């Protein structure tokens, strides 16, 4: 069975339409990818040969302006050739608006369809990367295989994704090289959150081997709210390995300290990546988010295997290829905490994106901070790794202990009842 899903968003007078055709074993929560690479080439495949996605943009003479119109789009049946799928419709919002353009049966059908996309687990070997480093190092290497190993239950606080390399369990933060190809400035990116999902995942920087886990607040797993017209995260979201935004350093251009995390990346390509995937990306620019008084860089990147990668070489190219996406990204980062009762986020540079050259200087700087961090005898974060320069060396015994402290991979925990709810933000 082939499913066809479409999400729609409006920005700057454009209707931005994204289409994803998925095999029944592939979804936004369970994409299985195999990536191989050399110094010059890389290919990506999924468990279904029919899997594809293309961004398309078109002007609309009548932009969507109200909830009824939008929900009509979201409840339209789409025949994919072998089955008809109802797309998800909104079921209320923070500010009262609820769709009335579809029947209750239609809304329930579409809600069930959307929920099925959230609940399929990753495979035990969900993502395998062939890159270039036999020996983990602080620079580019030359041949390695990584696979994602799940523990615990997805959507619960015991969920972990460990990364296994040729030496055994490794830290995706410390052991995967920053560069996939240093000469061409191609970086490795660890995917923490696939596009269109809501579960807020991150590398656990205080745990040995920094597995990916679900963020929590007051003992409850965190999910981002859907800010109209978006669904979950609107890009593949993750981080660059071997980087660190030093909280003891005030960034001169922003006037704020680093946020104590690896540097974040939004990958804007045409495919939904799997959680734990390691993508080869080129960086196009960066946005300087000021999050609760801290500098929180958001790098903009494109998978080098993407169909549009050759067209995207700097930040100005993004607007040409994906018109409206940068504006939507600023809007998303500004507003995503508002439904939780927090104020809107702020930005340095008035929310303007900096170009590729600027972004790469930021990356180089955060890489140097990371090199200093792993040499500290008493670091504030966990720096256990297999890189020779690290003071705290990782061992197979330590890895076995870390994994042994987590439960076996089990059934998914229930999703929150409001995970599909749309929230509307004014102003």
Curated annotation (Swiss-Prot):
Annotated CDD domains: pyrophosphatase
Location of this chain's protein in the cell: Cytoplasm
Residue span of region Disordered: 36-63, 77-118
Catalyses which reaction(s): diphosphate + H2O = 2 phosphate + H(+)
Annotated tissue distribution: Expressed in coelomocytes, the intestine and in the nervous system including the nerve cords and sensory neurons.
Biological process, per Gene Ontology: innate immune response; phosphate-containing compound metabolic process
Annotated SUPFAM superfamilies: Inorganic pyrophosphatase
Enzyme class: hydrolase
Compositionally biased region (Low complexity): 36-52
Cofactor: Mg(2+)
GO molecular function term, any single one: magnesium ion binding
Entry EC number(s): 3.6.1.1
Assigned GO CC terms: cytoplasm; neuron projection; vacuole
Composition bias, Polar residues: 53-63, 77-114
Keywords associated with the record: Cytoplasm, Hydrolase, Magnesium, Metal-binding
Signal peptide annotation: none
Disulphide bridges: none
Family: Belongs to the PPase family.
Protein name stated in the entry: Inorganic pyrophosphatase 1
Species this chain originates from: Caenorhabditis elegans
